């Protein structure tokens, strides 16, 4: 199929080099007409305002607009676009919802932005196999709305309502990661258009398998292990190509469909909040809860600055203090056991104001506030942008790094707060910065680099879920080493020899 599509594109424009790319912002007329021939004239734009909208995300990186924006309607058109750009040496930048935090959509070398939001179909739901196939325009909220009456749900939930293929591209995570894992644990297969237009199914066409295996355990089991797999799906067939493309940030190909692992909706759910006298006490409680093998589904930390911002933005009435938001899934009996054990642990660490949220509306209000923490922080300093760090460390080192980071933040003179998915060792400093103030921006970046190196020194990572993007490339080299980076470069060179896929990111 991909070969036929590529041949069709070449027949439309049979001579190589018909359009040598001009300076950034200037694709020649023939090339723009070629784009229109693939997707239709109404699905191509070179308007400055449209290009600028597609040259920025929610990061502090300055806008780098593409030369043109295209909206393909199906995978065949994506394949033809890739083949066309490959033949002419024009960079391609994938675009989903634009909610990334690392400058992943910035067109640093110009080129064509491929906006995939018009491809928004849920292609196949396999309830018996706990899997679903979605196109790149489907967001996590849209998928879960579609699944509402099926008894299944997809748990990976970053703060923004991101596109699911975009989440796969960045290796995203969320508040449920402590129990259900990240995108790396929940992607079974990917359909990828390679830089030259060929079509790849990373686990084979139509297959709903993954590498690795977890035993089958009933979902209602009280002490339920994270990342349990319902239905034995495993494969040892060759290299794990799915794992290669998850987290590749659009640098190896365009993800045009993903097969996701679904989970049974829990029988019962209870959320809880509790406040602490100090950051140390809150984070210590997190470690103790996990070490006690309480199968918490969510455990989120908000420092007192973030708690105050969330109270104001989301109209909560929580105590302004370091706080944990928790959620438990299971049978009614299991929940009672989990809540009792958790309350004992947090009280030993000085917790107060322990409250339960059993009703769905009350829980939704609580977790909506948590998901809106980024916007709550931005609202405290209007006109500024946010910079979010993203380190992740082994759970045993979490109290050390969070407490030290809080002390550094207080001493820095910067405006910021701490929030995070502490159940898996991942937390964020959300720093507010005037992007036009070079001195302040420099201090923010220095703070972030120092924190990244501290995480590496504690055997952690510089990014748990946001990706490398433009800003963490040096930290990536320090994390994986020279041989690791060179191996990545070699893989990139084989798949994308011209370096056209989302240039300037990761490597």
Curated annotation (Swiss-Prot):
PROSITE patterns recorded: FAD_PCMH (PS51387)
Official protein name in the record: Probable D-lactate dehydrogenase, mitochondrial
Entry's EC annotation: 1.1.2.4
Alphabetical GO biological process terms: lactate catabolic process
Transit peptide, start-end: 1-52
Tissue: Expressed moderately in heart and liver and at lower levels in skeletal muscle and kidney.
Transmembrane segments: none
N6-succinyllysine: residues carrying this PTM: 358
Disease per UniProt entry: D-lactic aciduria with gout: An autosomal recessive metabolic disorder characterized by D-lactic aciduria in the presence of normal plasma lactic acid.
InterPro entries for this protein: FAD-bd_oxidored_4_C, FAD-bd_PCMH, FAD-bd_PCMH-like_sf, FAD-bd_PCMH_sub1, FAD-bd_PCMH_sub2, FAD-linked_Oxase-like_C, Oxid_FAD_bind_N, Vanillyl_alc_oxidase_C-sub2
Complexes and interactors: Interacts with CSRP3.
Organism of derivation: Homo sapiens
Record-listed N6-acetyllysine modification sites: 36, 315, 358, 445, 472
Catalytic reactions on record: (R)-lactate + 2 Fe(III)-[cytochrome c] = 2 Fe(II)-[cytochrome c] + pyruvate + 2 H(+)
Name of encoding gene: LDHD
Keywords: Acetylation, Disease variant, FAD, Flavoprotein, Mitochondrion, Oxidoreductase, Transit peptide
Family recorded in the similarity comment: Belongs to the FAD-binding oxidoreductase/transferase type 4 family.
Outcome reported for the amino acid change (mutating residue 463 to M): In DLACD; probable enzymatic loss-of-function; contrary to the wild-type protein, unable to restore basal D-lactate levels when tested in knockout zebrafish model
Subcellular location: Mitochondrion
Function comment: Involved in D-lactate, but not L-lactate catabolic process.
Signal peptide: none
Molecular function via GO: D-lactate dehydrogenase (cytochrome) activity; D-lactate dehydrogenase activity; FAD binding; flavin adenine dinucleotide binding
Cofactors required: FAD
All residue ranges annotated as the FAD-binding PCMH-type domain in the record: 62-265
């Amino acid at each position: 199929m991909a070969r036929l599509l590529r041949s069709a594109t070449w027949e439309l424009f049979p001579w190589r080099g018909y359009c040598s790319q001009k300076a950034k912002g200037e694709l020649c007329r023939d090339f723009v007409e070629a784009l229109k021939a693939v997707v239709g004239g109404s699905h191509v734009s070179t308007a400055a305002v449209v290009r600028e909208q597609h040259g920025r995300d929610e990061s502090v990186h300055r806008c780098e607009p593409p030369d043109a924006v295209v909206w393909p309607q199906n995978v065949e058109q994506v394949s033809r676009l890739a083949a066309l750009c490959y033949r002419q040496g024009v960079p391609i930048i994938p675009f989903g919802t634009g909610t990334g935090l690392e400058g992943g959509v910035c067109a640093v070398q110009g080129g064509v932005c491929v906006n995939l939001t018009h491809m928004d179909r849920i292609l196949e739901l396999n309830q018996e196999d706990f899997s679903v196939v979605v196109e790149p325009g489907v967001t996590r909220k849209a998928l879960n709305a579609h699944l509402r009456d099926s008894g299944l749900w997809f748990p990976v939930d970053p703060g923004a309502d991101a596109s699911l293929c975009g989440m796969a591209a960045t290796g995203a995570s969320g508040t449920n990661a402590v129990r259900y894992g990240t995108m790396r644990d929940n992607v079974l297969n990917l359909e990828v258009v390679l830089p030259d237009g060929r079509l790849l199914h990373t686990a084979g066409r139509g297959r709903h398998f993954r590498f690795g295996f977890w035993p089958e355990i009933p979902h209602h089991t009280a002490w339920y292990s994270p990342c349990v797999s319902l239905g034995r799906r495993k494969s040892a067939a060759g290299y794990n190509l799915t794992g290669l493309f998850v987290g590749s940030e659009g640098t190896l190909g365009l993800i045009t469909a993903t097969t996701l692992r679904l989970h049974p909706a829990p029988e019962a759910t209870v959320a809880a909040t509790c406040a602490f006298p100090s950051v140390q006490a809150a984070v210590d409680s997190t470690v103790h809860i996990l070490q006690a093998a309480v199968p918490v589904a969510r455990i989120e930390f908000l420092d007192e600055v973030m708690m105050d911002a969330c109270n104001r933005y989301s109209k909560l009435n929580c105590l302004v203090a370091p706080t944990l938001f928790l959620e438990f899934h299971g049978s009614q009996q299991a929940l009672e056991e989990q809540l009792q054990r958790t309350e004992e642990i947090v009280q030993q660490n000085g917790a107060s104001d322990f409250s339960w949220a059993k009703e769905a509306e009350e829980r939704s209000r609580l977790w909506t506030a948590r998901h809106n923490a980024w916007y709550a922080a931005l609202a405290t300093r209007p006109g500024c942008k946010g910079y979010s760090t993203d380190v992740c460390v082994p759970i045993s080192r979490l109290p050390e790094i969070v407490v030290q980071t809080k002390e550094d933040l207080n001493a820095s003179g910067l405006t910021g707060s701490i929030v995070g998915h502490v159940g898996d060792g991942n937390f964020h400093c959300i720093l507010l910065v005037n992007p036009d103030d070079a001195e302040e921006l420099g201090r923010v970046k220095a703070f972030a680099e120092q924190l990244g190196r501290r995480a590496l020194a504690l055997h952690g990572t510089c990014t748990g879920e946001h990706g490398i993007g433009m800003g963490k490339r040096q930290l990536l080299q320090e994390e994986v080493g020279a041989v690791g980076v060179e191996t990545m470069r070699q893989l990139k060179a084989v798949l994308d020899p011209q370096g056209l896929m989302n240039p300037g990111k990761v490597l």
